């Protein structure tokens, strides 16, 4: 048989063959070593089930005045986007979808239904189906028994399609033409329609095919028109869209939510137009949970699919399907025939007699109430103890059960032990569908196993019995510890494959969850859900004390601590009369601002002892965190964690450098074997690089002029959060505390106001400068004492500030890096560039710099470029600090304030020059009143002049002992002290004398490292190096 004929003749087999081919392709890709998990394993086809779903939703959307035209138009655009998928499909594929839809719509009714049942994926496949059908009708004797669709592949169409299926069943073409055989759908479709959420029974939908006996209202005369039958079924099904469980799995969470919203909106619109009617089961399921609570695979009856079942067989198969399902609250329905007498449970009688009464009614009506009790188990009088033990959870021993219904209360089941099992409000509302009774029986059966000791489930590996299936599954997991899933990248093992899939996202950098509003991607669904709250503005966590709402639970907990701190401080006045534990004393001291622990070296105080131990690492140079890969040590855990991420990125780069997907990526433009770049975020305007994206965003505010932080007290804007916090502290200092220690109303600052006073009690004894904290005074005194507490452990060099030590230690780290890589990987780079302090060379003049930013600023001298431009007046500057100082003119901001006179200045250098006046005035006050400080200096200079009484050597020694006259030996004091021994020429400075002696000695100490030429002056060497750089 040709392939096209075979696909047309056996559409179900063709569809399942295509699915198996896709699964084999995906499995083959996973087994391949070059398979990249980042790429989606799901194939993109032209007619995916999700696309068909949203196509039907797009075509069947109804306009309603309550929604409004704008909302309806936006809903149509969203449905069309999910149907045509312009972000995935090409223009040709989108056109193919539109052409296929129009082609199917212009086909005759019988042909359209037949082609839709075969689910073609393109127009050519639909034409092939019609051509094969035409050949069969022209003269072949082959008869298609009908497409035996599997529930996982069959597409549940719209209400119009189901009406056409019903029409095709009653059509005379079934018996008079070969096309009728092709149009004959199997009975499983109608049974599945009923099980997928239809409120009518299959027998009610097919009255002519499956007549029932015993109920006069169920008989349908042959003369009854098909139009009347269709009018009875024209309800919510006309705008309803249903689908199989496999198709539901193809949809993501956004598509499922959109489907649920559209179905509920169509139901509300129909209810407002038609009037009140019975709520369909699909709507009930959508309001409760997902519409697919059933496994439709069990709905497929075995046997010959060609033979149409009778009404009894179909009812028996339906009952058997329902009884074999797990007890889900939203999955079962209770169907009662409209023509049968109402079945009810008598009040105050036993449940056993109630079921027997229902069994007797079965002889009169073949559609009894369906409950979760097997048909053969309804006759409880024939049950034995042995049978009950074998049946397990599916049997009910109703010996001690009474069905109670008290007027004004809910129904309940009562056990012999006195425990009641009541019907909840949700089940009570839907008790006419059988949910309430099923829920009571299910809960009662679980309780009954406790008394009877039934172990209805399987035995575990160790022989232990479990009464509940969930307990059995949990017990089996203890014996499957040996079965583990190992990560191929890092070797970590997991007990479940789903945990391994989540873990591998860390290596693949996959971000599968995307925000529907702004498009931002996330690695975890919880982070995406938390991010979407920003757009919706939902703040679910509300404080019951001040009614303030928060978006995150962590922020809510921090806010609750502020109330607890206020309460603790109120109780603090009674602290002497109460006995607290040491832990509470420590906690209360932390909240009240007490610093009980001091550092023995710098006298800095802290709240708790652990902070002191961490602080002392600065003095001891202890670095307890050591990297096992590069042997690098760190003082803080945060720096160690940030460093380990670099190794992870380097490992990820090495693993993927040979993959095709990463070869074409611009991120892999580095040479093979190169280490991971620490600074990966580049500023496009100034070229500065950063290690974090947040730091880059903060840096770009310099160019854009954005100031997102605004003070609520004075309205001033700030570009950085740190500057904003410092500014807010000034307002907190101005506020006066009321009634003892209290807290500011601002939640940003949770420190007592009493610690923010204008007093600066710590004063320097040498220069008179005052400070607020004692630690600041100790740091300041290093300027006078010359203390350098920060010492390099490798070379012994000492520094006054820790920042200078960190900058110096980079030299040693670069030296180690150069020793490891040698010069083979960087053959064109000189060793002194890697190991020296100045690593960045200017291509114009040959000058070197320690930082790349300084080099870029220096290049502006040659090019005349001024990169920093003011957005308000358009003035440009070559340095960033000059632009910042200039912008304060527009904002009238003067952040630098003199502590003596209160005068404010724009720049720090202006404040420094102003403070020198106060310093000179303070020194003049301490000096004798007869003469000023300048006169005193002149007098001391005159005393230190070299003369016959005081030789030159004694003059130099006296000058070196004076802290105020350090550079006196280089200042002209009337005589040139430095004399040349050869020619007798004298100079003011010794450096001038050394340079002069080179004329006599012909010394050329400056040598070019490239050509070997020597020079007497360094300026000549720098000028000579420019020639090599240009060449």
Curated annotation (Swiss-Prot):
There is a cross-link at residues 317, 374-375, 399, 567, 654, 736, 758, 938, 956, 975 (Glycyl lysine isopeptide (Lys-Gly) (interchain with G-Cter in SUMO2)). Residues 17-29 have a biased composition (Basic and acidic residues). The keyword Repeat applies. The keyword Transcription regulation applies. It comes from the Eukaryota. This is Zinc finger protein 445. A zinc finger (C2H2-type) spans 485-507, 513-535, 541-563, 597-619, 625-647, 681-703, 709-731, 762-784, 790-812, 840-862, 868-890, 896-918, 978-1000, 1006-1028. Belongs to the krueppel C2H2-type zinc-finger protein family. Keywords: DNA-binding, Isopeptide bond, Metal-binding, Nucleus, Repeat, Transcription, Transcription regulation, Ubl conjugation, Zinc, Zinc-finger. There is a cross-link at residue 28 (Glycyl lysine isopeptide (Lys-Gly) (interchain with G-Cter in SUMO1)). One of its GO terms (biological process) is negative regulation of gene expression via chromosomal CpG island methylation. Residues 55-137 form the SCAN box domain. It is found in: Nucleus. InterPro entries: KRAB, KRAB_dom_sf, SCAN_dom, SCAN_sf, Znf_C2H2_sf, Znf_C2H2_type. Its main location: nucleus. Residues 234-304 form the KRAB domain. Pfam families: KRAB, SCAN, zf-C2H2. GO terms for cellular component: nucleus.
């Amino acid at each position: 048989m040709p392939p096209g004929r075979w696909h047309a003749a056996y559409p179900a087999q063709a569809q399942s063959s295509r699915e198996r081919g896709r699964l084999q392709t995906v499995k083959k890709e996973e087994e391949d070593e070059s398979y990249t998990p980042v790429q989606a394993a799901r194939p993109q086809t032209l007619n995916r089930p999700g696309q068909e779903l949203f196509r039907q939703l797009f075509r069947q959307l109804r306009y309603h005045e309550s929604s409004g035209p704008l909302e309806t138009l936006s809903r149509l655009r969203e449905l069309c986007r999910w149907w045509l998928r312009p972000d995935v499909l090409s223009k040709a594929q989108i056109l193919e979808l539109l052409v296929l839809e129009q082609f199917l719509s212009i086909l005759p009714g019988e042909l359209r239904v037949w082609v839709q049942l075969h689910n073609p994926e393109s127009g050519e496949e639909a034409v092939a189906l019609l051509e094969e059908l035409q050949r069969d009708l022209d003269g072949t004797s082959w008869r298609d028994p009908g497409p035996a669709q599997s529930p996982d592949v069959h597409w549940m169409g719209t209400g119009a399609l189901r009406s056409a299926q019903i029409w095709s069943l009653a059509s005379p073409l079934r018996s008079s033409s070969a096309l009728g055989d092709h149009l004959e759908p199997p009975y499983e479709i109608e049974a599945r329609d009923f099980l997928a959420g239809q409120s009518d029974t299959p027998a009610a939908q097919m009255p002519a095919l499956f007549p029932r006996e015993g109920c006069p209202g169920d008989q349908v005369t042959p003369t009854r028109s098909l139009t009347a039958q269709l009018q009875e079924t024209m309800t919510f099904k006309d705008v309803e869209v249903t689908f199989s469980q496999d198709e539901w799995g193809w949809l993501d969470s956004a598509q499922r939510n959109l489907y649920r919203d559209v179905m509920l909106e169509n139901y509300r619109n129909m209810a407002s137009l038609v009037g009140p009617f019975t709520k369909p089961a699909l709507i009930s399921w959508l309001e409760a949970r997902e519409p697919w609570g059933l496994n439709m695979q069990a709905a497929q009856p075995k046997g010959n699919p060609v033979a149409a079942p009778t009404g009894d067989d179909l009812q028996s198969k339906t009952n058997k399907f329902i009884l074999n399902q797990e007890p889900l609250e939203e999955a079962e329905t209770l169907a009662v025939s409209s023509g049968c007498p109402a079945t009810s449970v008598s009040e105050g009688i036993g449940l056993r007699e109630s079921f027997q009464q229902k069994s007797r009614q079965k002889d009169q009506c073949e559609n009894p109430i369906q409950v979760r009790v097997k048909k053969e188990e309804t006759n409880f009088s024939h049950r034995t103890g042995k049978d009950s033990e074998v049946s397990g959870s599916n049997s009910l021993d109703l010996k001690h059960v009474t069905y109670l219904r008290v007027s004004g209360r809910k129904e309940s089941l009562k056990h012999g032990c006195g425990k009641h099992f009541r019907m909840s409000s949700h089940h009570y509302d839907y008790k006419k569908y059988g949910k309430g009774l099923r829920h009571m029986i299910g809960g009662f059966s679980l309780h009954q196993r406790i008394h009877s000791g039934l172990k209805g489930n399987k035995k575990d590996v160790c022989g232990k019995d479990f009464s509940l299936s969930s307990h059995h599954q949990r017990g089996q997991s203890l014996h499957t510890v040996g079965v583990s899933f190992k990560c191929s990248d890092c070797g970590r093992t997991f007990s479940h494959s789903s945990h391994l899939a989540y873990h591998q996202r860390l290596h693949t950098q996959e971000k599968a969850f995307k925000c529907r509003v702004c498009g931002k991607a996330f690695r975890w669904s919880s982070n995406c859900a938390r991010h979407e709250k920003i757009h919706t503005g939902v703040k679910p966590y509300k404080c019951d004390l001040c009614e303030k709402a928060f978006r995150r639970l962590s922020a809510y907990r921090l806010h609750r601590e502020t109330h607890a701190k206020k309460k603790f401080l109120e109780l603090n006045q009674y602290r002497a009369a109460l006995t607290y534990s040491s832990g509470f004393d420590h906690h209360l001291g932390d909240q009240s601002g007490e610093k009980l622990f001091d550092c023995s070296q710098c006298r800095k105080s802290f709240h708790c002892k652990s902070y002191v131990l961490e602080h002392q690492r600065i003095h001891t140079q202890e670095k307890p965190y050591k990297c096992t890969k590069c042997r690098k040590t760190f003082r803080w855990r945060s720096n160690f964690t940030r460093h380990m991420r670099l190794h992870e990125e380097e490992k990820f780069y090495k693993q993927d450098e040979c993959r095709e997907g990463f070869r074409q990526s611009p991120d892999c433009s580095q040479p093979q074997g190169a280490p991971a770049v620490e600074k990966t975020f580049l500023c496009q305007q100034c070229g500065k690089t950063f290690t974090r994206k947040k730091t880059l965003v903060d840096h770009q505010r310099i160019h854009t002029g954005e100031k997102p932080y605004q003070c609520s007290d004075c309205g001033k804007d700030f570009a950085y959060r740190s500057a904003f916090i410092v500014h807010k502290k000034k307002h907190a200092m101005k506020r006066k505390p009321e009634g003892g220690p209290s807290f500011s109303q601002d939640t940003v600052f949770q420190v007592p106001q009493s610690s923010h006073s204008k007093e600066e009690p710590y004063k320097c004894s040498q220069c008179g400068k005052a400070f607020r904290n004692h630690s600041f005074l100790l740091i300041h005194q290093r300027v006078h004492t010359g203390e350098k507490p920060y010492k390099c452990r490798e070379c012994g060099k000492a520094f006054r500030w820790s920042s200078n030590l960190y900058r110096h230690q980079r030299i040693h780290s670069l030296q180690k890096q150069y020793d490891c890589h040698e010069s083979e990987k960087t053959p064109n780079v000189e060793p002194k560039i890697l190991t020296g302090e100045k690593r960045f060379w200017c291509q114009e003049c040959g000058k070197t710099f320690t930082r790349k930013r300084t080099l870029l600023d220096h290049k502006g001298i040659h090019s005349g470029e001024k990169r920093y431009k003011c957005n308000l007046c358009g003035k440009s500057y070559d340095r960033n600090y000059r632009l910042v100082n200039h912008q304060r003119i527009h904002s009238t901001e003067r952040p630098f304030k003199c502590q003596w006179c209160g005068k404010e200045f724009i720049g720090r250098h202006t404040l420094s020059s102003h403070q020198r006046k106060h310093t000179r005035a303070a020194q003049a006050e301490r000096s004798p009143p007869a003469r000023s400080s300048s006169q005193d200096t002149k007098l001391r200079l005159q005393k230190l002049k070299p003369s016959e009484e005081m030789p030159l050597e004694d003059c130099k020694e006296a000058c070196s002992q004076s802290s105020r006259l350090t550079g006196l030996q280089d200042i002209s004091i009337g005589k040139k002290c430095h004399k040349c021994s050869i020619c007798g020429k004298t100079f003011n400075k010794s450096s001038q004398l050394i340079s002069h002696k080179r004329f006599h000695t012909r010394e050329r100490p400056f040598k070019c490292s490239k050509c070997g030429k020597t020079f007497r002056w360094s300026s000549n060497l720098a000028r000579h190096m420019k020639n090599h750089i240009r060449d």
